[in-house]
Swiss-Prot record:
Residue ranges, compositional bias (Basic residues): 33-48
Alphabetized Pfam families for the sequence: Fungal_trans_2 (PF11951), Zn_clus (PF00172)
Keyword Membrane on entry: no
Signal sequence, start to end: none
Source species of the chain: Aspergillus fumigatus (strain CBS 144.89 / FGSC A1163 / CEA10) (Neosartorya fumigata)
Region (Disordered): 1-48, 86-110
Its biological purpose: Zn(2)-C6 fungal-type transcription factor; part of the gene cluster that mediates the biosynthesis fumihopaside A, a hopane-type glucoside that enhances the thermotolerance and UV resistance of N.fumigata.
Full protein name: Zn(2)-C6 fungal-type transcription factor afumD
Gene field: afumD
Keywords, in A-Z order: DNA-binding, Metal-binding, Nucleus, Transcription, Transcription regulation
Domain of life: Eukaryota
GO molecular function per UniProt: DNA binding; DNA-binding transcription factor activity, RNA polymerase II-specific; zinc ion binding
Length: 373
């Protein structure tokens, strides 16, 4: 017969330290805490990594313009600190690590991209400002698509403007506005990343991307029933900012053996019509009595803006080709002073008044509206 006392003595005491079960309460709690603690993300401190990797405290491989993690997650990659001395300079081409739409995005459709490229080549290119001239039309329909194949920002800008044009031609096709917005957002984001490192290979494409973005934003403003002054001033800043981009690109390619494709656009740029400050039929937009709020510099800025509106209106009345008038309309920010834009952003009444007249005056032209849509 089994001795019950011997059996009991053979069972280890629950308080014994010879078994994992024998730990006291504090040791067990410590053990459980260690067990529950999640894996720690490996990282090293980086002063020049992108914003997102620094915020997450993970190692950034500092690939430019888009690091590995941001590319994997399909999110914008922002470098807000200059690279350390001796660091590898950032790549200027976006194609090495492209920012692509997510698989669920409606624009991530090869068939749609082919359709947009086809539409741009055959139809949208013919509506570009200045396309009444054969060399300008050929530039938009032949040279620009070719450049876009090796420069993602330009390719996405082409898709965006084609989708916008298609949405005007086929207003019942519901998905086009979203596709347009998606490609426009990608083009803007990528363009900002690339303009800091223009090369002889990308100079042409950078300039054409800048023009397409200006046309797209302007056409979008035209199609809105209500346009805020903030949107107008943003468009004006975008147009004026493009001058610095063009200057940088032209400086880089000026020693090239062959002239850049963008030169045909620059060469046909409409000259200012205004030779004086004649406001003509728009003189009612100017102050008749002095105002303590505005000094002589501000008054001159108002006169210049109104004189340009009047001069362009007279050119339209004289049957200037609608495509030329269209270009004048879109480069209005280049023909006014920076001071006028500052006054507009400060919401000075006399700066606010000319802008609606500028849009209304040309909005009445059906041909112009078609060419900028």
């Amino acid at each position: 017969m089994l001795d019950r006392s011997k059996m009991t003595s053979a069972i280890p005491d629950s308080n014994s330290s010879s078994s994992p079960r024998g730990h006291n309460q504090s040791e067990r709690d410590s053990y459980n805490r260690k067990k529950r603690k999640g894996p720690r993300l490996a990282h090293r401190k980086s002063r020049t990594g992108c914003q997102r990797c620094r915020a997450r405290r993970v190692k950034c491989d500092e690939s430019r313009p888009v690091c590995r993690d941001c590319h994997r997650h399909g999110i914008p990659c922002v470098y807000d600190r200059p690279a350390e001395e001796g660091a590898i300079p950032p790549s200027t081409g976006i194609q090495s690590r492209p920012l692509e739409p997510s698989p669920s995005d409606p624009s991530n459709d090869a068939h749609m991209e082919l359709r947009l490229l086809h539409h741009f080549t055959l139809f949208t290119s013919a509506t570009m400002p200045g396309a009444h001239l054969k060399r300008i039309k050929d530039c938009w329909s032949i040279d620009v698509p070719r450049l876009a194949f090796s420069y993602k920002p330009l390719l996405h800008a082409v898709f965006a403007i084609a989708a916008l044009h298609l949405s005007k031609v086929n207003p019942d096709e519901a998905g086009l506005p979203d596709i347009h917005c998606n490609f426009l957002e990608q083009a803007l984001r990528e363009h900002r990343l690339c303009i800091g490192g223009i090369t002889t290979q990308t100079a042409d494409a950078v300039c054409f991307t800048s023009i397409l973005l200006q046309i797209d934003v302007f056409a979008t403003l035209q199609s809105r029933h209500v346009v805020s002054y903030e949107q107008v001033s943003e468009w004006m800043r975008l147009v004026r900012g493009s001058v610095a981009v063009f200057d940088a690109a032209m400086e880089i390619v000026r020693h090239n053996t062959h002239p850049p494709n963008i030169w045909c656009i620059i060469d046909t740029f409409p000259m200012p019509l205004r030779t004086n400050s004649d406001a003509g039929s728009f003189s009612f937009l100017l102050p008749t009595v002095p105002d303590d709020e505005d000094d002589e510099t501000a008054l001159e800025a108002y006169r210049g803006a109104v004189a340009h509106i009047n001069a362009t209106w007279l050119a339209m009345e004289a049957k200037e080709h609608p495509q030329i008038s269209c270009r004048r309309l879109m480069v209005f920010p280049l023909f006014v002073t920076a001071g006028f834009i500052d006054l507009l952003e400060k919401r000075r009444p006399r700066a606010l008044v000319p802008c609606p007249h500028h849009y209304v005056t040309y909005g009445g032209s059906e041909t112009l509206h078609t060419n900028t849509s």
